[in-house]
Each structure stands twice: as C-alpha cells, then as structure tokens.
Amino acid sequence: MHMQLSSSIIRDGPQSVLVLAGEIDLATVPECSDMLTKFVDDHAGSDIAVDMRQVTALDDTGVGVILGAVSRARTAGSHLALVIDDQHMRQRFGL
C-alpha cells in the first residue's frame, strides 16, 4: 500500500520548519516539489529547515527534489537545513 505524503509547518524559535511525513517517490514528487517551492518562496531570506525524520521512503527522484529545494533556497538568500536521523538517508545526501 502506498503511503501518502503530508506536511506541516512549525516554528522553532526564529526558524520555520517544514515537517514532511510519508514517502517521497515518483508518485509523490510533484506534490513534494510544490510543498518545498512554496515553503522556500514564502520564507525567502530566512534560515529554514526541512524535517525529514518522518519520511519512510526516499527514492532518487525524491533526493533530486530535496536538493533542488536547497539550491532554490540558496538562490533566494535562505539557508535550508535538512533534519535527518536515518543513517542510510543521510548517506544519500552525503551527510
């Protein structure tokens, strides 16, 4: 059974955090991309984070969309931090 992707935005002090939960794969990448684009654009020039601790699956298309968001944030004058506690997932990002 395919798990949907969900998101919420929380404030952690001065930082806004986009919390992603579920699977980021070929089926959910368009939705994930839209979420990330809106989040980055809405917080341009700020320190922001994407919390991926509740992400249960991540394929290559998902890695690509996350890296695209990091680049978009940098272009917008933001610093985007990834919050990942799964070692395998951290390795996929070279962390």
Where on the chain are the PLM-derived regions?
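STAS-typified acidic loop motif
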Residues: H2-D34
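Amphipathic alpha-helical interaction surfaces in cytosolic regulatory modules
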Residues: E23-L95
